């Protein structure tokens, strides 16, 4: 959950985190290849990419580049595993309605499997939401450093704003801000690349001063965690594939998009580290020069993300409110209220949404650094969602029909994913 918006739009409709994607029969709502391409990019690429140069600083430019490439390829492979699992499940049960990630967990491990899958996705989405707040707080505290306000101060200032925005039930009014934030994100990346080019032209740069492979072994899993965090978008894989008009073309389209994203990630991480070397900060925008154009980009990012935050937490609200509908006490005392959330009262909705924002803000205020937090989420939640679960489900559902080579790959991915999750978590907690 990079900083990632794990909702993708198809026309005016939203494809939420765990909610079932469009049915096979609703062909009129399907997306074109171009629309699907855009949805894939929105689902994967977020402001987490602005932490990649710092990961390259920790691991070294060569190790960082290879790590991003490996993660990009593994992401593509495991996304295809998910699709194969879903297709197998649909063919066995003969149902036209597309299955979700949680359905795969239920088929493989029963109710516990569904709860595990949805819990990991829910927690990862919380992690991405916390990262939004940390990113905004760090940038604003840097811009207004002369006022003596810390990151925590700005996060507290954001709380009432985000609470009010979270009460908006329709997200259509906020969707332009998501696009605005993405534009600012791209501009910030261009600024960093421009800085690097200018430093090379002016001679204020020495390639030999940049580390290729870190001598500290802990730097490699740290950078790997950040890379996994930047690629995480598995919660949307099945929904995006199901929503495409020509579903058979999805794997090829996904390969092209992920290849392009991987190239941009490597280029940006490399250029960012080359530009600032050991001075590279965990959010690269903090390295930008203190001029009006750089400050405008930072403020633009913060404004865009402030209004995008409700979109980020929307799937969380949906999950919580779906659970509330099953509580007998609420159904008994608020059965007079009926809308899209059923018998859940407005008071319950506003209360839970307020508590969610306050809780996420409290966690964000305790985060020691953006890079450390991104690596922690990537090493734990995202690694399990992206690699361990898809390979495990693939082995369970299609195991009898797989050859020895494919089974070996699945087992290898599961083992490597678990080792990476355990060691990466330990390494991030104790510090690089």
From Swiss-Prot:
Tissue: Ubiquitous. Highly expressed in flowers and cauline leaves and at lower levels in stems, leaves and roots.
Keyword Endoplasmic reticulum: yes
UniProt-annotated location(s): Endoplasmic reticulum membrane
Disulfide bridge positions per record: none
Keyword Ribosomal protein applies: no
Membrane topology listed for this record: Multi-pass membrane protein
Cytoplasmic topological domain: 1-35, 84-115, 169-172, 241-256, 314-353, 401-410
Segments on the Lumenal side according to the record's topology features: 57-62, 137-147, 194-219, 278-292, 375-379, 432
Protein name: Amino acid transporter ANT1
Biological source species: Arabidopsis thaliana (Mouse-ear cress)
Lineage: Eukaryota, Viridiplantae, Streptophyta, Embryophyta, Tracheophyta
Gene encoding the protein: ANT1
């Amino acid at each position: 959950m990079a900083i990632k918006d794990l909702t993708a739009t198809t026309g005016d409709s939203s494809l939420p985190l765990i909610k079932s994607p469009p049915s096979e029969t609703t062909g009129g709502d399907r997306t074109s290849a171009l629309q699907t391409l855009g949805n894939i990019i929105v689902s994967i690429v977020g402001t987490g990419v602005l932490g990649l140069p710092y990961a390259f600083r920790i691991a070294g430019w060569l190790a960082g580049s290879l790590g991003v490439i490996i993660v990009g390829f593994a992401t593509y492979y495991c996304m295809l595993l998910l699709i194969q699992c879903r297709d197998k499940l649909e063919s066995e049960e003969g149902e036209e309605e597309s299955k979700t990630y949680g359905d795969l967990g239920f088929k493989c491990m029963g109710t516990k499997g569904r709860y595990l899958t949805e819990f990991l996705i829910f927690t990862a989405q919380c992690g991405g939401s916390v990262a939004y707040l940390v990113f905004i707080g760090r940038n604003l505290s840097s811009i207004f450093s002369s006022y003596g306000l810390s990151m925590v101060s700005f996060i507290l200032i954001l709380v009432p704003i985000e609470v009010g925005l979270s009460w908006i039930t329709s997200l259509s009014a906020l969707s332009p801000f998501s696009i605005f934030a993405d534009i600012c994100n791209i501009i910030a990346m261009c600024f960093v690349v421009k800085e690097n080019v200018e430093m090379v032209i002016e001679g204020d740069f020495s390639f030999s001063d940049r580390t290729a492979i870190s001598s500290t072994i802990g730097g490699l899993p740290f950078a790997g965690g950040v890379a996994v965090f930047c690629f995480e978008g598995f919660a949307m894989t099945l929904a995006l594939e199901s929503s495409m008009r020509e579903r058979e073309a999805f794997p090829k389209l996904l390969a092209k998009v992920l290849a392009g994203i991987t190239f941009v990630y490597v280029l940006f991480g490399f250029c960012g580290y080359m530009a600032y070397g050991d001075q590279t900060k965990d959010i690269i925008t903090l390295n930008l020069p203190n001029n009006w154009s750089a400050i405008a980009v930072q403020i633009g990012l913060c404004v865009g993300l402030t209004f995008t935050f409700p979109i980020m937490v929307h799937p969380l609200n949906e999950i919580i409110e779906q659970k509330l509908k099953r509580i007998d006490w609420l159904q008994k005392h608020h059965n007079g209220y009926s809308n899209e959330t059923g018998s859940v009262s407005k008071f319950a909705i506003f209360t839970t949404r307020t508590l969610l924002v306050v809780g996420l803000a409290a966690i964000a205020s305790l985060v020691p650094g953006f890079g450390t937090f991104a690596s922690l989420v990537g090493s734990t939640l995202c690694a399990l969602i992206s690699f361990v679960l898809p390979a495990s489900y693939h082995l369970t559902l299609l195991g009898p029909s797989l050859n020895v080579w494919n089974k070996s790959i699945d087992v290898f991915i599961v083992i490597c994913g678990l080792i990476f999750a355990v060691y990466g978590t330990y390494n991030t907690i104790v510090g690089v």
